[in-house]
């Protein structure tokens, strides 16, 4: 049985955020998971934070990509405003270390669970908004997005590299890529899969992910960039 772990001091989190709560109870509420069975938890603040994040991420993308169409902006936002995207932002704050969770969740690696981290991040943003202002929350969100999505662009966030790669290999080699599972490791709640991608028996890429689908997409992205570059060089040679 795992030992109970005491959360880090909330004041350390405030220092990271650059924001000090006037109402410390509000901060504790944002950091308390429902599994604790206390009189308060972060579900209501999560509801509020979800709406705030949807607005501010949308505004951030609207300003960052002035030429992007509505459909492109919607896809970009959908790639950030989701459980995985919020987990990434939560991890950049080491938010899991500050959470109050039950012993059962502690035993099940709850501090690293995507759902718990994502919900807590939404709750934290909701709490800051409730106590301060939308403008103040905006500065925090913008900083987090700039830090975590340095190379954010219209292609890298939502391009389906598997489909794009398949189009190239069919045109060049007359066949689709082969994805082979090389290894599978880790406990059930935190699996890691390594996938090798080959075309006509030649390996072009290997990548790992928390799911086979993620590992396939990562390996497809690597192979796509290699073959796309090769395709362009061949095309330019043909023009000479």
From Swiss-Prot:
One example GO MF annotation: double-stranded RNA binding
Alphabetized CDD domains for the sequence: DSRM_RNAse_III_family, RIBOc
EC number assigned by the record: 3.1.26.3
Active site per UniProt: 50, 122
Domain spans labelled DRBM: 160-229
Domain of life according to the entry: Bacteria
Catalytic activity: Endonucleolytic cleavage to 5'-phosphomonoester
Domain RNase III: 10-133
Binding site for Mg(2+): 46, 119, 122
SMART domains to which the protein is assigned, alphabetical: DSRM, RIBOc
Entry cofactors: Mg(2+)
Subunit composition and interactions: Homodimer.
Function: Digests double-stranded RNA. Involved in the processing of primary rRNA transcript to yield the immediate precursors to the large and small rRNAs (23S and 16S). Processes some mRNAs, and tRNAs when they are encoded in the rRNA operon. Processes pre-crRNA and tracrRNA of type II CRISPR loci if present in the organism.
HAMAP family: RNase_III
Similarity comment: family membership: Belongs to the ribonuclease III family.
PANTHER family hit by this protein: RIBONUCLEASE 3 (PTHR11207:SF0), RIBONUCLEASE III (PTHR11207)
Record's protein name: Ribonuclease 3
